[in-house]
Amino acid sequence: GCHCESGMPIHKTTKLETNNAEIAALAAPRPLKLISVGGDWTKNTPKVEYPYAQSIYKYFNALDKVENSHFPKEKHGYEYIKRQAMYPFMAKHLKLDTTGVLDKRSGDYDETGNTIETTQIMRNFHSATEMPVHALKPGSIVQFR
């Protein structure tokens, strides 16, 4: 998997164990879009994680707020086809005006006005030594009081 979102240190510690389905379902009843592909660990999302998320959303009477778009022939990444699946979901739930970005004939959203930032620009901290002294260290247990 990719360290960008599989986050194994948060899945299993000496004191707790969870999985992506449980973490995703924490969003309930807020809108949740699961985008999955056949070429990585999300390949089972339509049969495992998505039905689990639906079962949690059902408790909140919010089945209309959870969706899955699955691309069985795609590999890991967030390419154009996957972003195109996300845009209508976001437009619906954020009540966005799609005028000027949605091509009503093709159904595609125009991305030409988007700026792709470099990794360096997007980072809050450029190294572990720049993190605040009070920041949680990897593997820390969060305690609620």
Question: Where in this protein do the model-derived segments appear?
Answer:
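Primarily recognizes the serine-hydrolase "nucleophile elbow" in alpha/beta-hydrolase
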Residues: 1-16
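Alpha/beta-hydrolase-fold serine-hydrolase catalytic core, especially in secreted/extracellular enzymes
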Residues: 28, 35-145
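General secondary-structure edge motif
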Residues: 3-7, 33, 69-70
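Beta-rich catalytic cores
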Residues: 19
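Active-site-proximal cofactor/substrate-binding loop regions of enzyme domains
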Residues: 22
